[in-house]
């Protein structure tokens, strides 16, 4: 289990090249600095997109981004390891891998994560996120549900790469709703379906966590509606 917040300085992961007017990562990928207004506009809605269609767009973008960042990390770690030790990323310690994956996001202002891998044997990951850029962008908006769909996709993509099997994610608490931090549950699709339905029925995070750990199917609350999960076609 990793209960340490991922931490890093901007200088560790973002290098300025004043002569070029550019920012780059240590592995020479270009970085673009965007104002908070861009994030606000993105979550206010894309042209022609309703809130219902915007959610899966953000989730899928995050999912693919999470996969690609894990792929880049895999390449970097192979370069860092001793030539005689060329293990694949998924053979390395999960807390180490996830913290290395999350560190550039924290350095770039996307927030700091705490990863709880105590139930990783059941393919479950619990994430606590502080300083979510998406939640901050929605702070002044009237929202009645979690808004960090991009982050949910990121965490699902990262765990999918590490576990080499598809995982999904749901946000159960969000600072845009007044919670102290944003919380996510990442795991197999059927369990996340249940977690999303439970969230929609009004269950708190800890109750949803217990439900996701219970192998017995639980009857949904009378007021619960079928969950509209972003990754379902």
How should these model regions be labeled?
Residues 1-125, 133-150, 167-181, 185-233:
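N-terminal accessory segment detector
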Residues 146-164:
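Active-site helix/loop of acyl-thioester processing domains in fatty-acid/polyketide metabolism
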């Amino acid at each position: 289990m990793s209960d340490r917040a991922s931490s890093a300085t901007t200088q560790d992961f973002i290098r300025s090249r004043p002569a070029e007017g550019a920012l780059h990562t240590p592995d020479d990928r270009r970085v673009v600095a965007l104002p908070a207004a861009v994030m606000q506009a993105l979550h206010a809605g894309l042209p022609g997109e309703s809130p219902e269609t915007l959610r899966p767009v953000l989730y899928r973008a995050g999912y693919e981004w999470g996969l690609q960042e894990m792929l880049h990390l895999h390449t970097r770690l192979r370069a860092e390891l001793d030539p005689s030790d060329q293990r694949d990323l998924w053979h390395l310690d999960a807390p180490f891998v996830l913290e290395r994956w999350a560190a550039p996001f924290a350095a770039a202002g996307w927030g700091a994560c705490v990863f709880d891998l105590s139930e990783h044997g059941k393919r479950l990951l619990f994430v606590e996120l502080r300083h979510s850029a998406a939640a901050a962008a929605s702070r002044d908006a009237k929202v009645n549900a979690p808004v960090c769909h991009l982050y949910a996709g990121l965490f699902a993509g990262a765990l999918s790469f590490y576990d080499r099997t598809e995982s999904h994610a749901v946000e159960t608490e969000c600072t845009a709703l007044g919670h102290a931090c944003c919380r996510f549950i990442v795991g197999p699709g059927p369990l996340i379906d249940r977690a999303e339905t439970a969230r929609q029925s009004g269950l708190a995070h800890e109750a949803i966590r217990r439900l996701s750990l219970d192998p017995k199917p639980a009857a949904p609350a009378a007021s619960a509606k079928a969950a509209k999960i972003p990754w379902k076609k």
